């Protein structure tokens, strides 16, 4: 080895000089560089390392993963906190914590994804339920824990509602015999809508399909004087009732009003739920109703006492607990007259007589003796165009101004032109729905709205024809089984309902014409007090009219008498009313022509503006051609 080395050194010395070439090294190392380069020839394109400084990679499914994590957090919040209000607060707190930790983006926690999280939550619930069923082996094991978990699941499912997840409830706008109307804000588009919620009795699949078909017909109405219907859907409402150790209770109806109370309710409806909470009970129908406090000795054993009472619990800061039921889900419904599911809850030795649901309530607060029964009633939701000013509000404001005016000649409080415009648009809307084969059956100032700066008339709150499966808020019959005069036998308030409606006989489109006659009187006759109004409107049934109205507005008075005739066949139709002298007087014609002239002037101004823009564009193009260089 030493000799070899000396030979190499000798050859190097002999070949030394400036032109000598050094022998290549045995291993060729690349030059040092701050950016390491790798052989990427065999690496797929989607996995190649970027040449830029190392960054946390972002994948297309990162948002989906975060949404799933947010859905899991919401699911855990609902399971561990049954109270809807507090569970939402817990969910928001968890989201804020995960956002601060950098595990979530605030974007994925926004309300715009609430409907998507709803589908995730349902899938998680069904997955957990299936997994537990597969793991459970012993059918004789203790079911108390399972029952508790099931009650938690019901509490969660009650909150996975389309209404609760997609809308924020702002205020109550009104209530009627079959439902309440709420002002809501859509969490996704931020727009305000009106949603009417109608409670349906225990119904079959056929009944539900009938309701949905009719709602779809209403949603298809397209007319300037009809409130726009956007969509409709059905959700479940869980009603929990005691079964074994509690007697059947005939709960007092809170919605039954006297004649005077009915009139006062018209003024106070917007402040109806300003208090902390209220409970609305619908008519109970056990086999043998007992008065509050009475016991039923026949049902003190293990026999189940089934209820069909619908219980809707409201609170100022809390919504009803509902579970969405889409139309496609109706195929799975049973054909029984009522849909119900046995739901045993934990036993307790105390049952509070005043069953309330506030933000402090939870499973620990809602305790019943023995087993309980949860009945699944249906809640129909109808999303409509928001119209906050009703004709009732307009008339009330007009009456207020009339009371403040001392000199009638100096204060034209009747405003005949405006009243005629309102009534004409109302008749045009009624003519449209009658031509579509629909009878409104509940026309009154509170169901008629004035929309926009020009106060365009909008007819809303259509009564459903299938009223036999709708859950009324009160029992309109007295103890003798006869109809009380406070309300109609079907739908509508007695002051505006036709005689055939009050008598419970057959009625048709002419029943709406009677209501139009009453509204026509209110438009042209101010009232100083509510008692005066009730007396005058009641007198219409016997053909009595105020003398001042007959002298001041003879044409209107004539048609009021025609419209309120007892014999429905003698009442004019909507098309006959539109062709009558009621809308053909010189004053009305002048007013209509003035409105058309104003509209035509606006249209002409808009066309002139468009022509100017077109001429300017043409001039710019011509200048570009002359200059040779386009701008």
Curated annotation (Swiss-Prot):
GO BP annotations, alphabetical order? HRI-mediated signaling; integrated stress response signaling; negative regulation of translation; positive regulation of mitophagy
Q: Which modifications occur after translation, per UniProt?
A: Activated by autophosphorylation; phosphorylated predominantly on serine and threonine residues, but also on tyrosine residues. Autophosphorylation at Thr-488 is required for kinase activation. The active autophosphorylated form apparently is largely refractory to cellular heme fluctuations.
Q: Which PROSITE patterns match?
A: PROTEIN_KINASE_ATP, PROTEIN_KINASE_DOM, PROTEIN_KINASE_ST
Q: Where are the HRM repeats?
A: 410-415, 552-557
Which InterPro entries does the entry mention?
CC_SR_Kinase (IPR050339), HRI2_3H (IPR054521), Kinase-like_dom_sf (IPR011009), Prot_kinase_dom (IPR000719), Protein_kinase_ATP_BS (IPR017441), Ser/Thr_kinase_AS (IPR008271)
- The residues that the entry says bind ATP are 173-181, 196
UniProt EC number: 2.7.11.1
Where would I find the Protein kinase domain in this sequence? 167-583
CDD domains per UniProt: STKc_EIF2AK1_HRI (cd14049)
User: Where is the protein localized?
Assistant: Cytoplasm
Concerning its family, UniProt says: Belongs to the protein kinase superfamily. Ser/Thr protein kinase family. GCN2 subfamily.
The record, for PANTHER family, names: EUKARYOTIC TRANSLATION INITIATION FACTOR 2-ALPHA KINASE 1, EUKARYOTIC TRANSLATION INITIATION FACTOR 2-ALPHA KINASE EIF2-ALPHA KINASE -RELATED
Q: This protein is called what? A: Eukaryotic translation initiation factor 2-alpha kinase 1
Q: Which organism is it from?
A: Macaca fascicularis (Crab-eating macaque)
């Amino acid at each position: 080895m030493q000799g070899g080395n000396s030979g190499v050194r000798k050859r190097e010395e002999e070949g030394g000089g400036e032109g000598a070439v050094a022998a290549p090294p045995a291993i060729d190392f690349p030059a040092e560089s701050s950016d390491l380069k790798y052989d990427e020839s065999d690496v797929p394109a989607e996995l190649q390392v970027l040449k830029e400084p190392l960054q946390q990679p972002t994948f297309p499914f990162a948002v989906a993963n975060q949404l799933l994590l947010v859905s899991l957090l919401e699911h855990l919040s609902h399971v561990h906190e049954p109270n809807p209000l507090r569970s939402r607060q817990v969910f928001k707190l968890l989201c804020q914590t995960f956002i601060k930790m950098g595990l979530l983006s605030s974007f994925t926690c926004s309300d715009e994804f609430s409907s998507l999280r709803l589908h995730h939550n349902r899938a998680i619930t069904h997955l957990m339920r299936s997994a537990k069923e597969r793991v459970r082996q012993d059918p004789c094991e203790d079911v108390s824990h399972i029952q508790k978990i099931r009650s938690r699941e019901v509490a969660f499912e009650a909150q996975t509602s389309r209404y609760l997840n997609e809308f924020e409830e702002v205020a109550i706008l009104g209530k009627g015999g079959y439902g309440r109307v709420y002002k809501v804000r859509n969490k996704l588009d931020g727009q305000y809508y009106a949603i009417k919620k109608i409670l349906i009795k225990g119904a079959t699949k056929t009944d539900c399909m009938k309701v949905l078909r009719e709602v779809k017909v209403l949603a298809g109405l397209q007319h300037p004087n009809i409130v726009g219907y956007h969509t409709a859907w059905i959700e479940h409402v869980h009603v929990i009732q005691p079964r074994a150790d509690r007697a059947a209770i005939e709960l007092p109806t809170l919605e039954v009003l006297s004649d005077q109370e009915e009139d006062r309710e018209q003024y106070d409806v917007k402040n109806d739920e300003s208090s902390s909470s209220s409970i609305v009970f619908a008519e109970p129908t056990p086999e043998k109703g007992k008065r509050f406090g009475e016991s039923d000795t026949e049902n003190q054993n293990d026999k189940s006492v089934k209820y069909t009472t619908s219980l809707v619990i409201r609170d100022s800061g809390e919504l009803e607990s509902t579970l969405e039921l889409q139309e496609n889900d109706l195929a799975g419904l049973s054909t029984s007259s009522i849909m119900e599911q046995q739901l045993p809850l934990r036993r307790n030795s105390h049952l509070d007589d005043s069953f309330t649901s506030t933000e402090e309530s939870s499973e620990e607060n809602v305790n019943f003796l023995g087993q309980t029964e949860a009945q699944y009633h249906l809640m129909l939701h109808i999303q409509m165009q928001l119209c906050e000013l009703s004709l009732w509000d307009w008339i009330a404001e007009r009456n207020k101004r009339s009371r403040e005016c001392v000199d009638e000649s100096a204060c034209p409080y009747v405003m005949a032109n405006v009243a005629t415009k309102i009534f004409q648009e109302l008749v045009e809307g009624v003519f449209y729905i009658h031509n579509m084969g629909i009878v409104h059956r509940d026309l009154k100032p509170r169901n008629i709205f004035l929309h926009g700066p020009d106060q365009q008339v909008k007819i809303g709150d259509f009564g459903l024809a299938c009223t036999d499966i709708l859950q009324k808020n009160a029992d309109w019959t007295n103890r003798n089984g006869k109809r009380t005069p406070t309300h109609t036998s079907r739908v509508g308030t007695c002051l505006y309902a036709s005689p055939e409606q009050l008598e419970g006989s057959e009625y048709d489109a002419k029943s709406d014409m009677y209501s139009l006659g009453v509204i026509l009187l209110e438009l042209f006759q101010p009232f100083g007090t509510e008692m005066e109004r009730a007396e005058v409107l009641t007198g219409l049934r016997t053909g009595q009219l105020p003398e001042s109205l007959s002298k001041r507005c003879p044409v209107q008075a004539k048609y009021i008498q025609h419209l309120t005739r007892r014999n429905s066949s003698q009442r004019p139709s909507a098309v006959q009313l539109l062709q009558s002298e009621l809308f053909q007087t010189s004053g009305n014609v002048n007013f209509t022509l003035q409105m058309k002239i104003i509209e035509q002037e606006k249209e002409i101004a808009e066309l002139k503006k468009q022509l100017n823009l077109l001429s300017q564009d043409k001039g710019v193009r011509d200048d570009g051609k002359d200059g040779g260089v386009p701008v």
